Every structure is written in C-alpha cells, then in structure tokens.
C-alpha cells in the first residue's frame, strides 16, 4: 500500500516536472501598455527587456528589484546605457530584496507608493511562475499583472532546482507562511 502511494506521488512529481520544463512561460504577446514594469534582478536579459518596455512606451516607470546595495544609480545607468533623464524620471532601483519572496514585498510597497494599477513582470522564463505566484500573494487584487518572460536556455540543474523552489513556494502559500 505504501509502495503504491509513493509510486503515485513519484509519478505526479515526474509529470509535474515534465510540464514545468516543456511549458516554460513565453514573452507577452501583444499585451497593452501598463503603468509600470517590474524587473527582479538575477537573470540575463531581464533588465534589457525591462528597458525595452520603457523605451517603447509600454510602461511609464520601472522598478528593478533586488539590486546589490553597492550598485550606484550612475553605475547602473552606465552599464545599461540609460540616459540620466530616464533614470531620474522613470527607473527606481530597489535595494531591499534578496530573494524572490522579498522581491514581491519590495514590489508591493513600490506599487502602493506609486499608485500602480497595472504592471508587467519581466523575468526569466524558468523563474516566471514562482515570481508571479509570490507577487500574487502580496499585491492587492485590483492590480493587473502581465507576465512577460525572457526566453533562456536553462541547464537541467537550474530547472530542477527552480521546480523544487516553485513547489516549496506553493506549499508555503497553502500554509500561508
């Protein structure tokens, strides 16, 4: 009996992992403009995509969450070729977050302070589900979130680890931790 239960649980885990790998989120298709774009640091192409969203007028403001506290705004602007005027008006560097859960908390505070009603979440495809899930738990219901995944070529180990982080995040959400 226990062997059957464990076999079923293992099968569910395998099917879930295969779904996770095969059905990675994609870039937002023809989504309209939002009040803001949110970019958690940590993956290649995220900040560039966020700046592209700003430059094309799909968002008015951008929060880059989880920036290393030692990074100065001028250094950020130089590295990503952001004009000083755009840094001043439109780009906020968030230094409080250290992980996906604290990215969501930092984002929720920034959203409230800036009266954001719609946002575009830009993160790597393999990270999108967990980042969006954490964000959904912290944002008010009236805030619309568009998921805009940055395509990547993740290694097996990255996918394996992220799948388990997603499971842990969902379990924590069920337990309301």
Task: Indicate where each model-derived feature is located.
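Hydrophobic membrane-insertion alpha-helices, especially the h-region
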Residues: 3-20
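A structural signal for short, hydrophobic/glycine-enriched beta-strand patches
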Residues: 22-160
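A transmembrane-helix-recognition feature enriched in membrane-embedded lipid enzymes
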Residues: 158-177
């Amino acid at each position: 009996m226990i062997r059957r239960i464990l076999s079923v649980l293992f099968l569910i885990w395998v099917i879930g992992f295969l779904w996770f790998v095969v059905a990675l989120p994609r870039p937002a298709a023809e989504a309209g403009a939002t009040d803001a774009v949110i970019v958690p640091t940590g993956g290649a192409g995220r900040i560039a995509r966020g700046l592209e969203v700003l430059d094309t007028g799909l968002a008015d403001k951008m929060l880059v969450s989880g920036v290393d506290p030692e990074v100065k705004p001028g250094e950020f602007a130089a590295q990503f070729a952001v004009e000083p005027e755009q840094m001043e008006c439109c780009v906020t560097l968030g230094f409080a977050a250290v992980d996906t859960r604290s990215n969501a908390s930092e984002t929720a505070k920034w959203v409230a302070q800036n009266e954001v009603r719609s946002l575009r979440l830009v993160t790597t495809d393999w990270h999108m589900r967990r980042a969006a899930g954490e964000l959904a738990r912290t944002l008010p219901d009236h805030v619309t979130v568009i998921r805009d995944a940055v395509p990547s070529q993740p290694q097996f180990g990255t996918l394996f680890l992220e799948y388990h982080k997603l499971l842990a995040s969902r379990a924590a959400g069920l337990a309301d931790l």
